[in-house]
């Protein structure tokens, strides 16, 4: 089939909207009767006043209405403007009605629930929802509905059987659902965008959920021989194995106590400090944001690394001031887990693992730092990545300065002892 949807009788489904379905309304309640008083009385006067603008065949019963039409429609004149917004209106009554939208005043209240609305039309539409005034006209069916579309859908699906799929006899309650069903499952012109990526499997599917059901039932997950993590397909397993290859991972997070220990993630370094060393050994730049440390140094005159005693005091000051803004290390673990879950979802969606691994299409921004081959599609993400490198360099610089200051302090402690010893030797002579 093409794009046109037919019912069981061969009639285009789009024409169902044009069909006239006999509808009977229940007798109005007192509230609905009151609505009739809000309707403007219709005039029986003939429309003898015609608009003389080219291409306009409008006619009106009064000259004042004709003048109003010409000023508003053809001349664009709207004399009544709202002082709270930029809207303007032809009639003063329209402006007064609009002003209710800027206030809490609701002049029309529902007699059933007391809800307030701003116009009579809104009150009419609201009060009708309290009564099932639309009655099914079929014999033996006394169902009532609040709204006309509900009644129409009931008649089409239950009594006329015009919302049944001609291919699989599946019934639907709404015409658009039948159209979507036929388009997804029975239209030969619609391609199958979801393909199975398992080796030797060439099956294609129209919807993503069908592909997921196929993978779950027909292709078991492959487990990693190192960590036993289940992976989707051979591509997913190959991509996962990269994290176990140390030669492909850049390790920029180094322990300042253990010279041979370096890690690829900050979280792993913090875990190392927690398991091997004490919390006091963790550098400040790992526990807090480097920007917060710089701000405290600038605002409060904290000096880092002048002496061992002052260094401990200043670090304690910084720790106390930053404790409330401290980033818990667990956040890094949560972020990593979210990335793992996102990666697994993308693999399960049928994306090729090689494309995920070498996704360089349209990535024109390449990181210029050594041992970093990251590429980006947008300048914003590229600059954000470069900022991370700069922050890391600043952290390394702070560590280096602390080590140099510590060396100078140790030398200053030794020099007085050497001078005193030389003086004593000279006195003995």
UniProtKB/Swiss-Prot annotation:
Pfam families in the cross-refs: zf-C2H2 (PF00096), zf-C2H2_4 (PF13894)
Name of the gene encoding the protein in the UniProt record: PZF1
InterPro entries for this protein: Zinc_finger_trans_reg, Znf_C2H2_sf, Znf_C2H2_type
One MF term in the entry's GO annotations: zinc ion binding
Domain of life according to the entry: Eukaryota
Note: Present with 1380 molecules/cell in log phase SD medium.
Record's subcellular location: Nucleus
Stretches with biased composition (Low complexity): 24-44
Any single GO BP term: regulation of DNA-templated transcription
Name of the protein: Transcription factor IIIA
């Amino acid at each position: 089939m093409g794009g046109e949807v037919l019912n069981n009788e061969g009639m285009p489904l789009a024409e169902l909207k044009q069909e006239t379905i006999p509808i009977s309304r229940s007798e109005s309640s007192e509230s609905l009767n009151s609505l009739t008083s809000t309707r403007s009385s219709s005039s029986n006067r003939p429309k003898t006043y015609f608009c003389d603008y080219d291409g306009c065949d409008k006619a009106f019963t009064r000259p004042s209405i004709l003048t109003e039409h010409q000023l508003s429609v053809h001349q664009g004149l709207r004399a009544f403007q709202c002082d709270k917004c930029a809207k303007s209106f032809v009639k003063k009554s329209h402006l007064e009605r609009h002003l209710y939208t800027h206030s809490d005043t609701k002049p029309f209240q529902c007699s059933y629930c007391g809800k307030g609305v701003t116009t009579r039309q809104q009150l009419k539409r609201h009060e009708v929802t309290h009564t099932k005034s639309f009655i099914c006209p079929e014999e033996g069916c006394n169902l009532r509905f609040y709204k006309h579309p509900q009644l129409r859908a009931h008649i089409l699906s239950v009594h006329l059987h015009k919302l049944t799929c001609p291919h699989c006899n599946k019934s639907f309650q709404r015409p658009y659902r039948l159209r979507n069903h036929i388009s997804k499952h029975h239209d030969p012109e619609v391609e199958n965008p979801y393909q199975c990526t398992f080796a030797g499997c060439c099956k294609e599917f129209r919807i993503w959920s069908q592909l997921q059901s196929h993978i779950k039932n027909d292709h078991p997950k492959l487990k990693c021989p190192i960590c036993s993590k289940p992976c989707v397909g051979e591509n997913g397993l190959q991509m996962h194995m990269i994290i176990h290859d140390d030669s492909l991972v850049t390790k920029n997070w180094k322990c300042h106590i253990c010279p041979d220990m370096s890690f690829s993630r900050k979280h792993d370094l913090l875990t190392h400090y927690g398991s091997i060393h004490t919390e006091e050994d963790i550098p400040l730049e790992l526990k807090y944001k480097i920007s917060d440390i710089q701000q405290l140094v600038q605002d409060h005159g904290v000096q880092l690394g002048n002496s061992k005693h002052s260094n401990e005091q200043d670090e304690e000051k910084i720790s106390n001031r930053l404790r409330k803004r401290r980033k818990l290390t667990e956040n890094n673990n949560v972020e990593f887990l979210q990335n793992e879950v996102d990666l697994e979802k993308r693999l399960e969606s049928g994306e090729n693992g090689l494309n995920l691994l070498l996704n360089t299409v349209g990535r024109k921004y390449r990181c210029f730092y050594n041992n970093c081959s990251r590429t980006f599609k947008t300048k914003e993400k590229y600059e954000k990545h470069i900022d991370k490198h700069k922050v890391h360099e600043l952290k390394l610089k702070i560590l280096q300065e602390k080590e140099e200051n510590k060396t100078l302090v140790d030398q200053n402690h030794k020099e007085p002892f050497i001078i005193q010893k030389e003086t004593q030797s000279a006195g003995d002579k």
